[in-house]
């Protein structure tokens, strides 16, 4: 026996479109209209009842009236490569005289009295979703840029400070070099004087001047050694600053 044609008008007729993002509940509306002169009972069914919440999912539409049904898709991990196989069916029949127990009405309904329409579900990610994403990227990029500028400024300041320290150390090195040169000249002069004194001492056989000369040489050697150590320390400091 041929199925009775659906008397209700559906908007949309064939597809229920859900626009993402799907990280929160997404709601779409289905409008059911009753263009007849009789009241019509309806019921909305789905192949994935755990994924959707339908309000109202059943009821009676008066003659010439219409009703909006909210279909709420629950949050889920959306995969654009996965096609939705979810479907909805709007089942209807003309309301009997007694509608006090709708559960019994549906149970006692004859198959030939039932009318149904099927709709498939479509998931979409609209182009508008890309705009907030671009805004977020624009927000992130300046933030990242500002963060990268800070180390650059720090490096510049550090570099200028290092240059100042190097200049000071170089000036100190020049001063120490001059001091070493002066001490070398003094040492040379002392040696010449000591040579003369030693010759005189040898002639006079006096040990006292020899002790004095040894003390002077020891003092000069100690000062030279201290300068060499200082040069070594300065060299290490320059090496660290250069790195």
Curated annotation (Swiss-Prot):
Bias (Basic and acidic residues) ranges: 186-197
GO cellular component terms, A-Z: endoplasmic reticulum membrane; plasma membrane
InterPro entries membership: Ig-like_fold, MSP_dom, PapD-like_sf, VAP
Membrane topology: Single-pass type IV membrane protein
Modified residues (Phosphoserine): 146, 158-160, 206
Function, in words: Endoplasmic reticulum (ER)-anchored protein that mediates the formation of contact sites between the ER and endosomes via interaction with FFAT motif-containing proteins such as STARD3 or WDR44. Interacts with STARD3 in a FFAT motif phosphorylation dependent manner. Via interaction with WDR44 participates in neosynthesized protein export. Participates in the endoplasmic reticulum unfolded protein response (UPR) by inducing ERN1/IRE1 activity. Involved in cellular calcium homeostasis regulation.
Similarity field: Belongs to the VAMP-associated protein (VAP) (TC 9.B.17) family.
Name of this protein: Vesicle-associated membrane protein-associated protein B
Organism: Bos taurus (Bovine)
Primary gene name: VAPB
């Amino acid at each position: 026996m041929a199925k009775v044609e659906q008397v209700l008008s559906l908007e949309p007729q064939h597809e229920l479109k859900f626009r993402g993002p799907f990280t929160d509940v997404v709601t779409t509306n289905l409008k059911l209209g009753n263009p007849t002169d009789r009241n019509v009972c309806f019921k909305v069914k789905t192949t994935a009842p755990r994924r959707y919440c339908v309000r109202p999912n059943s009821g009676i539409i008066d003659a010439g009236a219409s009703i909006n049904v909210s279909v709420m898709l629950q949050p889920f991990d959306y995969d654009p490569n996965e096609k939705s196989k979810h479907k909805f069916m709007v089942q209807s029949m003309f309301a009997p005289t007694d509608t006090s127990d709708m559960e019994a009405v549906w149970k006692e309904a004859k198959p030939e009295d039932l009318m149904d329409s099927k709709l498939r579900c479509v998931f979409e990610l609209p182009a508008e979703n890309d705009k907030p994403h671009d805004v977020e990227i624009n927000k992130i990029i300046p933030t990242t840029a500002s963060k990268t500028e800070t180390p650059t400024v720090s490096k510049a300041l550090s570099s200028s400070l290092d240059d100042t320290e190097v200049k000071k150390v170089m000036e100190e090195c020049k001063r120490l070099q001059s001091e070493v040169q002066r001490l070398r000249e003094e040492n040379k002069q002392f040696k010449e004087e000591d040579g003369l004194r030693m010759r005189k001492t040898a002639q006079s056989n006096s040990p006292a001047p020899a002790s004095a000369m040894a003390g002077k040489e020891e003092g000069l050697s100690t000062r030279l050694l201290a300068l060499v150590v200082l040069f070594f320390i300065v060299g290490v400091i320059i090496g660290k600053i250069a790195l």
